Amino acid sequence: MKPCIERLPRHLALAACVLALTCLPPARAADPALDRAAAAMKVDEVRTIRYSADGIGYTFGQAFRPGEAWPKINIRAYSRSIDYGTASMRDEIEFIRGEALGGGGYPHAAPQRNVELVSGGYAWNQVVTAPVPGSRFVAGRIHQLWITPHGALKAAVRNSASVRKATREGRTYDVATFAEPGRFTATVFIGQRGLVERVESRVPDPVLGDTPVVTVYSEYRDFAGVPFPTRITQAAGGHPTLALAVREVQPNAPVDIVLPDLVRAATERVTAEKVADGVWFIAGGSHNSVAIEMKDHVVVVETPLNDLRAVPALAKVREVVPGKPIRTVVNSHGHFDHSGGLRAAVAEGATIVTQALNKPYFERAFANANTIRPDALARSGRKARIETVDRKRVITDGVRVVELHHVADSHHSDTFLMVYLPKERLLIEADSFTPGAPNSPPPATPNPNHVNLIENLERLKLDVEHILPLHGRVVPVKELYTAVGRPSP
């Protein structure tokens, strides 16, 4: 997603680049090996495709402890529809948690259904009938579209892949290597029958930097004259992410994906609400931050998601607290949606404060550059400074006190921190409690994360009046107690 049309607004230039690359008429491969593979796979005949499957998935970036495997989900039904001509894809996934520990925000007992889309340079989720823009998903979904078996060959031809012979485990492959500029790099392994058997790709990631992804296609069958694998496995960042058994394939199925106007017009919105003297709630999107003004500097709690969110959030902090450097950024926990903006914080010159288990993981991650799409950290040339919290740490300038506490015994993350301002009686937390709509009834069964948060507040004897959640709105603490069916203290 490089801005190849410099005078357009960034989001329009992005879309124009993608469409310019993906809406061209089919090109013929210059290399005979790609020609043979295209003929074997019926690539030019496949304009759209839909396939359904079931199996196992894993929630990338949501490990219970840093470095552990991604949490497992059981996929009951999976449907993917692709229009290669418009670079559009729709995934419909029905699943249930496969294990208790780890993140993802999924119910602990009930099944969930996700509808995830991408078209050109835009991504969104469909929640009932409402589209929810998701710019942070564009890169990942475009990558997934173009590493499908037919997509990989189309992308290899379009990007003038270099082709060589290679032997692996006694088998000879035609190996095509190409780059989708600003998106990903890929190496496609084509077997002796001309079928795509493996794609090794690298994608930019807000936490890990350039990240290896390995996708394996096997047990091909003929579907209406088109070969397609019935087994798909994938790993990313060193751990499995997918294991599918494909049940049905429909080449050239009707695929009608319309980009909603709301998604096309969406921009990154950042707001600031003063909740106490020198304390600002930075909101406006799916993830929040908090700015805490000290005597001669600013402490920021959370730089989430990626540069697209973190950079304007930090700019908003400088706007509401002018003239003081952002010296410290506190990370609530290691899950990637909450740590994806830490590279931007390092580029800002801030010291990262995180739970002790995260430090070696973050040090390795931040030392691995994003070269495919350079981020703020890569451009800055700075090195990360990381300090830690085990169970408790206090930041003070002699006037304001900021307490950092480990959230013990959580099922969500073993590296959870919450931030407490005793004078202001404010609690800042992520994922332990996300407030529902105002006046909504409590769930029939209390959320274990809510119960765990109350247990920690009571164990530590924290006197809280309001909660500043890193998802959702500022609420009085009584809403937490109401959510678990208990009177507030």
Q: Which residue ranges define each predicted feature?
A:
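Divalent-metal (often Zn2+) His-rich catalytic cores of metallo-beta-lactamase-fold enzymes
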Residues: 233, 454-489
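Flexible, processing/modification-adjacent segments and terminal tails
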Residues: 32-35, 107-186, 192, 203-209, ...
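Zn-dependent metallo-beta-lactamase
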Residues: 241-295, 393
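Bacterial N-terminal signal peptides that target proteins for export
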Residues: 2-16
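Active-site metal-binding motif and surrounding structural segment of the metallo-beta-lactamase
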Residues: 308-353, 459-463
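N-terminal mature ectodomain segment of secretory-pathway/periplasmic proteins
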Residues: 32, 39, 43-131, 159-164, ...
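Conserved beta-strand hairpin/beta-sheet module of binuclear metal-dependent hydrolase folds
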Residues: 273-319, 416-435
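Gly/Pro-enriched, hydrophobic low-complexity segments
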Residues: 169-260, 417-422, 429-430, 435-436, ...
